UniProtKB/Swiss-Prot annotation:
Organism, scientific name: Macaca fascicularis (Crab-eating macaque)
Key word Acetylation present: no
MF GO annotations: extracellularly glutamate-gated ion channel activity; glutamate-gated calcium ion channel activity; glutamate-gated receptor activity; kainate selective glutamate receptor activity
Keyword ATP-binding among record annotations: no
Name of the molecule in the record: Glutamate receptor ionotropic, kainate 2
Residues given in the record as L-glutamate binding sites: 516, 518, 523, 689-690, 738
Amino acid sequence: MKIIFPILSNPVFRRTVKLLLCLLWIGYSQGTTHVLRFGGIFEYVESGPMGAEELAFRFAVNTINRNRTLLPNTTLTYDTQKINLYDSFEASKKACDQLSLGVAAIFGPSHSSSANAVQSICNALGVPHIQTRWKHQVSDNKDSFYVSLYPDFSSLSRAILDLVQFFKWKTVTVVYDDSTGLIRLQELIKAPSRYNLRLKIRQLPADTKDAKPLLKEMKRGKEFHVIFDCSHEMAAGILKQALAMGMMTEYYHYIFTTLDLFALDVEPYRYSGVNMTGFRILNTENTQVSSIIEKWSMERLQAPPKPDSGLLDGFMTTDAALMYDAVHVVSVAVQQFPQMTVSSLQCNRHKPWRFGTRFMSLIKEAHWEGLTGRITFNKTNGLRTDFDLDVISLKEEGLEKIGTWDPASGLNMTESQKGKPANITDSLSNRSLIVTTILEEPYVLFKKSDKPLYGNDRFEGYCIDLLRELSTILGFTYEIRLVEDGKYGAQDDANGQWNGMVRELIDHKADLAVAPLAITYVREKVIDFSKPFMTLGISILYRKPNGTNPGVFSFLNPLSPDIWMYVLLACLGVSCVLFVIARFSPYEWYNPHPCNPDSDVVENNFTLLNSFWFGVGALMRQGSELMPKALSTRIVGGIWWFFTLIIISSYTANLAAFLTVERMESPIDSADDLAKQTKIEYGAVEDGATMTFFKKSKISTYDKMWAFMSSRRQSVLVKSNEEGIQRVLTSDYAFLMESTTIEFVTQRNCNLTQIGGLIDSKGYGVGTPMGSPYRDKITIAILQLQEEGKLHMMKEKWWRGNGCPEEESKEASALGVQNIGGIFIVLAAGLVLSVFVAVGEFLYKSKKNAQLEKRSFCSAMVEELRMSLKCQRRLKHKPQAPVIVKTEEVINMHTFNDRRLPGKETMA
């Protein structure tokens, strides 16, 4: 008998039952906690504590389970396995064991050999493999089930290269731990072909932690810029050994590629002055990150690091932070794939996990802001190529952030001092520096004292005062040492070695060189200089020439011989022009008998001799009885008077100086004069900046001078300025030296003088070893002294001296025979000439009288002589037969003295 319940066949009832069953299942599902297992494989050392990565793995799982924010309905469990270092077989076995239990992902191991073994198994079975350390990826990488949270080293290598370029390093030493270091730093190793960079590569010893032999070799090779690619344990050991080797000074700059530099104990090196730079990926400035790290520290203290690890207690290492972030990134993918279930997998069956591909894709697409910043992956190779790095540097306060780097923007240096104002004494305060110098008056000299002096008190001078001012501003103490070989510093052409103060700076035997050390191109290549504290140039020191008297004919000196000749020619030319114009101008003829207005005879005073006499009279400022009447002749006379006014005024103005000033005639006036002769020897300080200037100069004159000096090297090059000055005083020798020293010497020795101007222009600067952090501080202090006027005051103090005695001033210099004796000679010559002319005139007149009176020449001459000696009135000699000239003939006459007026028939 079949019993039928009509209600069961009701469609409405059936839909209601299905809905209730669905709701019950959903409620059951939401109330049920899903359990998911992660696997972790970690290396360990026998009898060692739990590793930081394993501890971080457990810490991350426990944190997620406690918070229930990321996975509210999933409980994470873990299975951790420990293996020996580099044991790939054991790593494979442990991985298979975990896969048989059923794990959603395997974390670790760290070292490449073990990681590769686990990776191959994960690829075969489709289980994600999560790495937190760098692993070399080949170009045809087929590890599709692999992601790494460690920053991609091709990007990290670019960050290191950017840092090298920022510091403007020209030489770099790369020290790596194992062969993979060369792969990690491939961008840097390629740099020399693209940048002006010299690269030296060294490897740390593989079988021992003793790096002292390598460090000793680097110290001997003066390798100050070093990049260490090694673990933080090795980095801690290297720092300790470098400190013992004296390589933790301000001249060394180390860059560490390890991201755990911030966790090292750097307390012993804070005040050493060493430059230490590195990167940090842990975002410690984030408050949430700091809170997590603080919780981590409490658990870490339960399993402190090994004593020889070099890490500070409680610090979270980068590996631990990456492991913490790795667990959270995988958990994000779990959150997005709630229907995922884990099944047991067997390594020998090669049956992949059915959810593996989808789950791996979700992991690569995951985004997470973790302890190490933003986390994203390259979907192709699973590498972390987008990340942010903090650039950290060692300061006296500890390791501080000085910049950031990211693949997109590159390096951004901020030098943040946490709001502290910049202080130029930061790197020099309370430091004790070795200062090398050289004895050179007035820069550095021994202090004169009745009591014995010791240490820095033995010295005084301009450079000592400068050093004292720098010490006051920058707050350092110093010890002054004289350079051992007594040289400034020059390079030997044979072996390229330097000497003097430059060598001591190169060898780091001194921290500063405060001396008259010139800034030159060749020196700047091996040491650093501050801005110049004194500007100068090369000049010539020579004896003052002996004074020469003006000479008896010195009255001719105001005008050059050419001008005297031109004046004479001008006088002759003007006389001739005046004569011609006076003859042709009708207004220059006049009636010699004004009482007889009807006279037809006219005369012209400007004969050739009278014209010349007019010009000479005007030139001598005496005038004459001749005066031009016509406008044309007056124009000639006026222009000539103006000309003579200027000439005589100029002559008079210069005459006093030429008669009273004692002339100094030097055989040389410039470097060209020195180069053109060989009689006067010349030289400079051996191995000094002046010698180097002539040695390197390409200018023909200076090259010729260097050829002369090098050919007589033993005789013309001196050891010091004092020796050169003494040679100038005692022999025919010109000394090439700095103009400031010449200024000092000439103010104290009146027998010496500077010849010519400056041959070049340069400056004195404070020398420091190459790359010294003190240079910029000293430059700022020097500029401060310059603005305050203290540099000028110090120069006045040491250069002023007593000076040469000034000559007594005279209102009017007494002129002696040696000054104006020539005037008397000219006077005597004029008198003698006038006597001879008078005799000639006497003879000429006697001959004329004899012809007129038709008598002998001797009788006429005797009569003229008798009448001249008696000083009686002379009678005019009359001719015997007067000559009558007709009017027509007179009119046509062109004589030089008179002419007839036109229209007259007879002459009275």
